[in-house]
Amino acid sequence: MKMSFRWYGKHDPVSLEEIKAIPGMQGIVTAVYDVPVGQAWPLENILELKRTVEAAGLEISVIESIPVHEDIKQGKPNRDELIENYKTSISNVGKAGIPVVCYNFMPVFDWTRSDLNYPLPDGSTSLAFLKADLADVDPVADDLNLPGWDSSYSKEEMKAIIEHYRHHISEEDLWANLDYFIKAIMPTAEAAGVKMAIHPDDPPYGIFGLPRIITGQKAVERFLDLYDSPNNGITMCVGSYASDPQNDVIAMTEYALKRQRINFMHTRNVTAGDWGFQETAHLSQAGDIDMNAIIKLLVDYDWQGPLRPDHGRRIWGDQTKTPGYGLYDRALGATYFNGLYEANMRAAGKTPDFGITVKTVGDK
């Protein structure tokens, strides 16, 4: 397991130097943020990003993400051109020696929350999705701008995209378009040595009348069967899947591990119900997920991929520029998961490697 941390590039208020100081931190999860969606990522842009990260004593473990253009998701006539650009980006990521790309196939937005500062009993705040708060909201009729929406579209363009999904794209249509996309990009990913890792819908159920397809175990089974290759894998985001109480994330994790198709792990805890869900501290008792059981499975199956602590609470006056992505609680999460990993590794008679170089006072 390689502990990793999301970094939003040079404009992220959390610095690489701060991330490097987290015990056992090895990898950075980041992206090229200055290339418009649909265009190919130039190799030099990726290499420049890599040099920046490596100068801080870290390495890029995952690209998260190369966004998929809405015209690909909707199966528009120009999708082949856009897919060729996507394949070029994958090839260039491989040339840069970066092993994993996380992406999603969610219509319109990457994630949705109704509240960015919902209070927890311990006095901290976190991200929450309260169904009642959005029950009467229509993103087309209302002047709405929710977090996770793609800011590269104007409001008028966004409304047109949403209406097209509602009236012309069913869940089966979206599956067909995903199948087309996967079969087109996977030979390139295999040749480039890049493992693709699809992220689940967040939340993993229908909202605003839009189709949602990567939502639970049956969806994961269907997705992995689209293209049988280790390069066609998933991001096992336990917090996203557990946002639907019907999902058994421990069983789902073991299923995907048995198939050797977890290419990236996101670990955050949530408490969920018919009312929606709220993100919590990472500790097992704080939410619905037995985090020790998750990490034990990774050890049992000798999983060697990148893992990052997902969204954190806002604590100790942490920054608010990137909701859920402050330094402090994610750092606590990283040390917590490394602790679970070490305990389970030693219980299995194995020695964990956190990539730490130990120096004494006399070392130069």
Curated annotation (Swiss-Prot):
Belongs to the mannonate dehydratase family. This is Mannonate dehydratase. It is an enzyme of class 4 (lyase). Its EC number is 4.2.1.8. Keywords: Iron, Lyase, Manganese. It comes from Streptococcus equi subsp. zooepidemicus (strain MGCS10565). Catalyzes the dehydration of D-mannonate. It comes from the Bacteria. GO terms for biological process: D-glucuronate catabolic process. One of its GO terms (molecular function) is mannonate dehydratase activity. Pathway: Carbohydrate metabolism; pentose and glucuronate interconversion.
